[in-house]
C-alpha cells in the first residue's frame, strides 16, 4: 500500500524533522547541515512525491547569479554532475534558481524509500554545495551572464 499525503508529515517527523505545512500536500523543513542551512520542500502531487532543496545555494552566496542568469558553461557543468548522481538531480525551478530534487512515484511508495531519498538529498548537498558554488563563481569570472 502506498503512502498517502496525510502520512508524509509522520514520515518526516520519524526522520527527526519538524515539517511545517504549507498546504495539505506540501511541507517545508529547515535543517542545519555541515554546509549550512538547507531548506527542503516535500510535495505530494498525486502520482509523484517531489522532494527539493530550494534554493540549493545559501541566500546571498552567489551574488548576481540565479533567477535564470548564469555564466556561459555553468549549466553544462551542472548537467555533467547529474550524470554521476543517483536518485537526485540538479534542476532549475520556475524562477530559474538551482535546486536539488528527487522524484518518487507514489504507487507502492514506502517510508523507507522516502528516507533514502532524503538521505541522498542531504548527502549530495553536503558533497556538492561548495564545489558547485565554486564552479559557478569561477565560470562567472571567465564570462559575462548568459
Language-model regions, residue ranges each:
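Long, continuous compositionally biased terminal/linker segments
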Residues: 33-61
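Ordered, soluble secondary-structure elements with a strong preference for glycine-centered loop motifs
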Residues: 2, 68-69, 108-115
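Ampiphathic alpha-helical segments that act as solvent-exposed interaction surfaces
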Residues: 73-85, 110-135
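Charge-rich, low-complexity N-terminal segments
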Residues: 1-39, 93
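A generic structural motif
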Residues: 57-61, 104-113
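Short, internal acidic amphipathic alpha-helical interface segments
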Residues: 52-99
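Hydrophobic residues embedded in beta-strands of well-ordered beta-sheets
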Residues: 26-27, 47-49, 97-98
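Short, highly charged C-terminal tails/helix-capping segments
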Residues: 133-146
